[in-house]
Amino acid sequence: MPVSFVHNVLEVVTPYVEYYQENLTKWYILIPTILLTLNFLSILHTKYLEYKFNAKPLTNFAQDYSFGVITPLMLMYFKWHGTVMEFACNVWNNKFLVLNGNVRTVGLRIMGLNIIETTDPENVKAILATQFNDFSLGTRHDFLYSLLGDGIFTLDGAGWKHSRAMLRPQFAREQVAHVKLLEPHVQVLFKHVRKSQGKTFDIQELFFRLTVDSSTEFLFGGSVESLRDASIGMTPSTKNIAGREEFADAFNYSQTYNAYRFLLQQFYWILNGSKFNKSIKTVHKFADFYVQKALSLTEADLEKQEGYVFLYELAKQTRDPKVLRDQLLNILVAGRDTTAGLLSFLFFELSRNPTVFEKLKEEIHNRFGAKEDARVEEITFESLKLCEYLKACVNEALRVYPSVPHNFRVATRNTTLPRGGGKDGMSPIAIKKGQNVMYTILATHRDPNIYGEDANVFRPERWFEPETRKLGWAYVPFNGGPRICLGQQFALTEASYVTVRLLQEFHTLTQDADTRYPPRLQNSLTLSLCDGANIQMY
């Protein structure tokens, strides 16, 4: 290399080096320098992993020059207005899929973190099943701990395996099949529907009360009886239990609050309001009442108890009050909210699709009768599974409105995802240890490349079409892989039973013509309708 060339380079570089030596300690130079250096090292590390794993650069990357500060603020804005899920679907189905063909994976920044967002069924399969050990729950345990503690919904690794082994027997077929336990609660629900006298009312609010009543009875051995109120001339038999009246509202508030904490990722602790902490204390106080009641019983007493109570069965395995409370609340989140949301969306769609409603009603009446001729004793776990159109309606409600529309995992090691890189998006992409990977099932379920141009339309008939029966990982309403929902059959059975009983008793279902559609969606830990399911039923 000529000496003159080196001399010329030094002449050019030396002033810059001297400038940085003099000014590097100044914050307005130091901070940008650190950020640029970290960004350069991050890019270098990514390139190394791509070389190591024979991966390709991301096809899609959403630029955010605010280092990911604007993105969560924008998401919070849409969430506050009940349109964050609608926004997510529009972004995927109207931007990335259209501009980049069949690419369903994108890189973005949230609070300075480089995050991968995907709706690709192959990537979802890898995250949840084939590469299960490469991913963990990340910060989920941290931001949910104050409410749910250490339970199956929040734990990873050995703790999760122990929880699952302890809980799996509680969802055996004989427990799931006990639909008759629902009937007393359904009878109270009927009173509320009749009270409306054909006028518009919010059935979602009733469904959430119904499922908290049935879930607390199944789990705790005593219902909060939130449906039994003065408006129908009833009073709860459990009114003296501490925290009973406030429990449902406190549980709802704490979950909604946690959904905002989720958007802040590792900065979740910024949101820690007094009402949030008060709500958690109310929830724990109610749960502790029943835990102490169970622990006051001897092993012999527990064996003598009539009927099935989830808490009593767990108390045979452990006498630790915190373990019992944590597991109960973890199951309550999944069991209560998913069923209430499913029923709400199903009846919201049935009320605006009269042809579907009449067809479903006909199937139910033919199999189980109606009104005074209703053969309630014939509605069993087995007979519900034979109702093909009912199953199609439930499947379609879960497709258009999955209970958990958006979720995430964190890489436990340097790894890959099978698709999202290269010019066509079909090559593997590198994932760094500690990197967040989000998957939006709602957008997958509404992908026109998978479900056709009517992917956003509630159409149960699609479940009788051959191509829909081969969806694989393009339909995952209850997650999949080792962490597949233990209580999915419980939720499906309860939702089906309640649907059958309502359509046996009430033969007209409508909604106001000016009802907003698509509806505004609220995503706390599970999906629900922002404005309720306002219908007329008589």
Curated annotation (Swiss-Prot):
One family name in Pfam for this protein: p450
A single GO molecular function term of this UniProt record: heme binding
Bilayer topology annotation: Single-pass membrane protein
Chain ranges passing through the membrane: 27-46
Entry keyword annotation includes Heme: yes
Keyword check for Secreted: no
Classification via InterPro entries: Cyt_P450, Cyt_P450_CS, Cyt_P450_E_CYP52_ascomycetes, Cyt_P450_E_CYP52_fungi, Cyt_P450_E_grp-II, Cyt_P450_sf
Top-level division of the source organism's lineage: Eukaryota
Outcome reported for the amino acid change (mutating residue 442 to S): In strain: EH15
Residues involved in heme binding: 485
EC number of this enzyme: 1.14.14.-
Compartment(s): Membrane
Cofactor (UniProt): heme
GO cellular component, one term: membrane
Annotated family: Belongs to the cytochrome P450 family.
Name recorded for this polypeptide: Cytochrome P450 52A4
